[in-house]
A protein has these predicted regions:
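Bacterial N-terminal signal peptides that target proteins for export
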Residues: 1-10
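Sec-dependent N-terminal signal peptides
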Residues: 11-16
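C-terminal motif of bacterial Sec signal peptides marking the signal peptidase cleavage site
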Residues: 19-22
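Solvent-exposed, non-transmembrane regions of membrane-associated and secreted proteins
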Residues: 24-134, 143, 154-202
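Structural motif
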Residues: 137-138
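Short coil-to-beta-strand transition motifs
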Residues: 142-149
Length: 202
């Protein structure tokens, strides 16, 4: 990762990295993530006007040429902290989930929006695709209010268990979207989360 991207990630969004449990599994192995085209489920173009804040319902990842390589529902139930420490974000199943303490997606949202999901070493999950996201890709969120598009600015691994408490690093940035999962490399779980940082474009 270029030094500038590393500094930006570490100083701006370190505290949004989640400690996600349940990333390992005893089931059969799965294919490595790739950018193979999939059918898009978000066909309506992002509107030119404002989109009122609303909980996200669907997420897609698209390459710079507009090819969709991830299309997934977002879990209807918001994600909350759990675990004995109260510092664990653990989605209930393989679907990504919106973190209820973060901003609600919309063109006027002042807070950073966070969507987190599992990535398993031995079974499939939509957010395994985060590993193949590159800067310049597009993240599309569909809500009940409309569709939002975000340009990916930075990607990379960060240590699990980073701050979820009050900290200067956990600042609100209008239009910012963070995607995070358990990082898996070579079919094995790591001690990192993989984080994608994107900025609202329309």
């Amino acid at each position: 990762m270029p030094p500038r991207s590393t500094r930006w990630l570490c100083t701006a969004i370190l505290t949004f990295v989640l400690l996600v449990s349940g990333c390992a599994s005893d089931e059969v192995g799965i294919a490595a993530p790739d950018r193979s085209p999939v059918q898009s489920q978000i066909s309506v173009a992002a509107p030119a006007g404002d989109v009122a804040p609303a909980q996200p319902e669907y997420i897609e990842l698209r390459s710079s040429d507009g090819t969709t390589y991830l299309s997934s529902p977002i879990h209807p139930d918001p994600l909350y902290r759990g675990g004995e420490s109260g510092q664990v974000l653990n989605p209930v199943d393989e679907l990504p989930a919106w973190w209820a303490e973060s901003g609600m997606p919309g063109t006027s949202t002042e807070q950073t929006v966070v969507v987190a999901g599992h990535n398993y070493s031995k079974r499939d999950a939509p957010f395994k695709a985060l590993r193949v996201v590159t800067p310049g890709d597009t993240v599309v969120l569909r809500t009940a209010s409309g569709t939002l598009e975000y340009a990916v600015e930075s990607v990379g691994p960060l240590p699990k268990g980073s701050l979820l408490a009050d900290n200067e690093l956990r600042r609100s940035v209008p239009g910012r979207l963070i995607l995070a999962n358990c990082d898996v490399q070579g079919g094995e779980p790591t001690d990192d989360n993989f984080v994608v940082v994107a900025q609202l474009v329309r």
